[in-house]
Amino acid sequence: MEFQKMHENPDVLHVGTCQNRSYFLPKAPEDGEESTRVCLLNGTWSFRYFDSFLDVFPEGSEGEICFDEEDMDEIEVPSCWQNAGYDRHQYTNVRYPFPYDPPYVPDENPCGLYLRRFCMNAEDLTQKIYLNFEGVDSCFYLWINEQFAGYSQVSHSTSEFDITDLLNEGENSVAVLVVKWCDGSYLEDQDKLRMSGIFRDVYLIRRPLAHIRDYFVKTTVSDDLSHADIRVEMDFIGLPDVTAELYDAEGALLESTAGAEPNFALENPHLWNAEDPYQYTIVFRTADEVIEQKVGISKIEIRDSVLYFNNVKIKLRGVNRHDSDPVTGYTISSEQAKRDLFLMKQHNINAVRTSHYPNAPWFLQLCSEYGFYVIAEADIEGHGAAAQTGGYGMDEYADNALNPIFDKAIMDRIQRSVIRDKNNACVLMWSYGNETGWGPSFEKAGAWVREYDPSRLTHYENTYYDARGHKNDLSSLTTESRMYSAPEWIDEYMVDPKYTKPLVLCEYIHAMGNGPGDAEQYQQLIMKYDRFMGGFVWEWCDHAVYGGTTPDNRDIFRYGGDFGEYPHDGNFCMDGLVYPDRTPHTGLLEYKNIIRPVRAALVNRETGEIQLTNYRDFTNTEEFLTLSWEIQQDGDTVACGVMDDIKIAPHESGVITLPDAIPTEGDVAVLLQYSAKKNDSVFFEKGHPLGFDQLIVSRGARKEEALRKGFVIAVEDSRAVTVTGDSFRYVFSKTEGVFTSMVKNNVNIMTRPMTWNVWRAPTDNDQFVRKEWEQAGYNEPAIKVYACNAKEEDGVVVIDCKLSLAAVYRRAFLHLDCRFTVDAEGKVRAEINGKRDMERPFLPRFGLRMFLPKSFDTAEYYGYGPYESYCDKHHASSLGHFAQTADDLFEDYVKPQENGSHFGCARVTITDGAGAVTVTSPEDFSFNLSHYTQEEMTKKMHNYELTESPDNVFCFDCKMSGVGSNSCGPRLAKAMQFDDETFTFKFDLTVE
């Protein structure tokens, strides 16, 4: 039979596929845990790769596929063929990887032909045989025994074929031609590494001739939650006799009924929620088949623009999750998915958005079992249309949504998502897709969703713009969804009468690299407004391809541009809360503590009363909370204890009283550490940390030690001031305005001259302001000293210096008026007064940089630790005494950038155990100790390319700007910018 091309015809989406149904795997009546009705075809298949679709049909083939296995390679199914060495990886976010010409795709379109054999016996052939593909990117043609059996697209949805009539007794063959791009690819422009192939399970299902084709378990709950009805709508092939049995979670039979429309009634039902994911089980039985279906009962409502779940105002503490693994790509096993979900639970996350496509069908079963609210998203994203003219136009953005050729596909994709996953308790919202604009196709599909399943909420973000004159009809949407909205806009939303729906941020606090730095600001708003349902961090994991290790055993993770591809979007795929290997970023630790289940506030210092608020939605603290408390004075613990009998209802507050007095002098804090009260055999054990509060009661005045007066002299020449005492000799540059040598006890503590420091290796969130910084010359300042005078005065040496920082061809951006006082023991007391050019952007930082011997590898400090901390990202850290090495302090981002700074410090000592450099200040400052210079981290694109400095780099800063989330979110908040017109930096520098 001559081949008929279908993959550029939007009117032909599926050929030979069965009608959509919910996901279930039937069993034989005698089966145990595993089903003998299901035969996995995963494993080794024969494979032939073609660089072009045109190569599939060589000259003389007369348009027929060659199924000869001779000279075919082998490939594992499921997998992505790029991970097997074929084609190449590509990462692009918005831009399509081919010209925008819907519905057409290039003829030079890579393909893969898969072939394997399987056997059928005579008994098998008396039944219905279905062939299922759970995920194939982007489309595929199917042959059974070299007879054409069908065609299907929608990469992340199940395609099921009835192949009964094409089978023979004995050996049979299945052949699949997978095409990299099709007309559907215009709706699959998701922000991810682009891969191809049969990437999810393939299996056969044997079913009796008469069987249950589909069912929809519908639950209703009375207003007072005292009664629930379960009604099952069923569809059949043939007319099997059906019985249905309802079991509780412990396996006790509650009720049995017969008939085609089973109904159950429950008094005082145990309702499902993410904190208590209780599920009943319905067992459907026919003469030859058993189907088990988990059922979670809940009541989802919007009242007065507020989300209620089982009559409770819940909050979504969510993440966006892609199927992504650095080794297996899109192919994700249940064990890999469980690892993600367990990590989420361990970090207080309660919601997942399946961005931007349906995950494997069993993934939602796991979410229902473990307790996650899910935004179940259809396989739709078409934002590449916005780039069709080379720019980024809002009218063009919606072209796919407005183009009638995609009406059928958009309806199909949304229906496939809803129908497949409708029986999962975890589904809170049906999402129509992502970033495709809005148009009649979505309006029609949305109306279908609301009619088919009115029990869930509906979601779509890209609705705020009426493109090309179309007046958006948003009546099918129950929520207002936005992404990366600034906190100020959220405040405006809540008081603007035109907004009447509850708000969710489907993407926020972009977690790329060192960040997010503004999570607490958003969380305060989530807690403030009932109408603000919560948000979903973009995103869960960094996307990368594992490239092995370097000769010195450093992991190689590759991202956009590392594969020679065009177009690409660099490391924009490296934007997760966890590294590709699932090691948590500090951003995940930050988010975990910001969404901690309990928060504290000091009520009365004298009586030791502290108010605790329980932010769990359904669980009393007596069920989950052990509280360990410490009273800290100047970083030392002066009293401590444990409380595990605290009873506070959900959303309520209670007061505890510490049995010990809170000091009244010095730096005083109360540290409250929340941990799991009991074992949870799945997620974590008793004592697992849930978060903490550190209540800063007071910051004591820092006493300035008197300078030691005695023998100290200064000798000047045209270039330097040399300051000498009994045990030291320092050289101060009159051209740079800093010390170039500091010899103490005959040892020069500096391997290179000190430098003024305003630059930081740009974080991913600095990528836009970086251009402004470089234009201002912050990355390459030259120093001009206008005046430098030294004098011996009352047993000390005073150096006064006026200077500026300016880059070549640009005017000065910073003027400094400095005084350095050196006492008889070599202590340097500095007072630096700065004045900025306010026409320039805010500074990354301001401070000084020292280069120390490699042996000076330990930082002992009093500040925020142990994790990297910034003015807007320090909620995973607490104020205290810490000792860490340069390796400990380094956060190894795949793309090197500013990392490892510590905020809120009063003191830091860099030591090798014998010598030491100490900085103290009357005001909080930041420091960093690293093996790498900021110049090295600025120019290198991958962490495995970094070359260590021959010295250790010690930076101490008057102030460091925050990190924010501007890689995709709002510009760094003004309050977190180092944007002061004038400032003063005072510190003491001691060398021992």
For every predicted segment, state its role.
Residues 80-83, 87-90, 95-104, 153, ...:
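An acidic-aromatic loop/edge-strand motif
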Residues 142-144, 226-257, 282, 609-644, ...:
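Beta-strand-rich binding/interaction modules
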Residues 114-116, 157-161, 260-264, 652-658, ...:
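Short strand-edge motifs at loop-to-beta-strand transitions and within beta-strands
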